[in-house]
Amino acid sequence: MNSNNVNKILMDNTINLINQKGSFNYEVKEKLIINIFNEKDKNIDITIIQNNNSLLIINYTSINYEECHINLNVKINGNNNKCIINFRGIACENNNNVSVCVRANNNTFGNEIIENLKGLCENGSIIIKPILEIDTNEVQASHFVTIGPLDEKLILYLESKGINKENAKKILKKSFIYNIFNDDFISLLNDKEGNNE
């Protein structure tokens, strides 16, 4: 898929993006699932419009060694939509800035918004901004943000099972980033990883 300004009206699709860069603009008609896995993001902007009776699921993982800026914007212009955003970010070095904004416009009803955003600070820092702009009383909305380091107790537990510290960290990071994806997308990631070795 071309990484420059993709504009599409999508009916019932799953889009898998691996290490894509640039800006993306989509309009959801019925159902859209976007799986994104990016290593070494610099700047990425995604804007999605939901009109009526649609389901949008965004599963996004970002692993960064350099400073990056990620912007996810969803505009809900209609009624009876569901928007679920799952984000996992690992800041390996430098600063990572992530902004996730969902806006439900005035005079809309029956919409549901869920933002589940998690950051892992390895040797860098991560800032995650969950933004809900709600101009109506007729919406169910929730957001969750968790940021922290790898759990040293889990590393110690894996070491007690004979796994060295570096492999224990790799296992925990892989679990952290893969748990939002379905098996088909994980297979794509594993195939890509196998081809890069």
List the predicted regions and their residue ranges.
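Short acidic DE-rich linear segments
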Residues: N196-E197
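Conserved beta-strand/loop scaffold segments within soluble protein domains that form the structured core
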Residues: N2-I163, I171-N179, D184-K192
